[in-house]
């Protein structure tokens, strides 16, 4: 019985991708295909894994407020977006506004850091 509990614990810790890979491996080994009963049984174990897979990979950097150093924020927005000075100023004046969309987590964090260093308030969505 202890072995079954250990197996259950290991299966519960699988990500959705790992669970799908396991299903394919077992289908090949046993010469069967996953039917509805298998999918129903896997739903309980896959629920926590679905949350892990749903983790965002693309973010939107939103300028929520320019802060006290508006000129510095405008310069950073101009550099990040490639906009002209007038367009960057308009974007900053109209905060909250998205600065950049569909960026990876690392790039979004980098942009957020630059804007916050200039005195802006920023959110990642």
Swiss-Prot record:
HAMAP family: Ribosomal_bL12. Pfam families: Ribosomal_L12, Ribosomal_L12_N. Transmembrane segments: none annotated. The lineage of its organism: Bacteria, Pseudomonadati, Pseudomonadota, Alphaproteobacteria, Rickettsiales. One of its GO terms (molecular function) is structural constituent of ribosome. This is Large ribosomal subunit protein bL12. The keyword Glycoprotein does not apply. The gene is rplL. Belongs to the bacterial ribosomal protein bL12 family. Keywords: Ribonucleoprotein, Ribosomal protein. PANTHER family: 39S RIBOSOMAL PROTEIN L12 (PTHR45987), LARGE RIBOSOMAL SUBUNIT PROTEIN BL12M (PTHR45987:SF4). One of its GO terms (biological process) is translation.
């Amino acid at each position: 019985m202890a072995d079954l509990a250990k197996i259950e614990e290991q299966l519960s810790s699988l990500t959705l991708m790992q669970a799908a890979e396991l299903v394919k491996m077992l289908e090949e080994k046993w010469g069967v295909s996953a039917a509805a009963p298998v999918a129903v049984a896997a739903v309980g174990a896959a629920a926590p894994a679905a949350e892990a897979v749903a983790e965002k990979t693309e973010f939107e950097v939103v300028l929520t407020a320019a802060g006290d150093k508006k000129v510095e924020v405008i310069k950073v927005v101009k550099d990040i977006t490639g906009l002209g000075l007038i367009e960057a100023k308009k974007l900053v004046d109209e905060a909250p506004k998205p600065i950049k969309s569909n960026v990876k987590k690392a790039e979004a964090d980098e942009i957020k850091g630059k804007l916050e260093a200039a005195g802006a308030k920023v959110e990642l969505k």
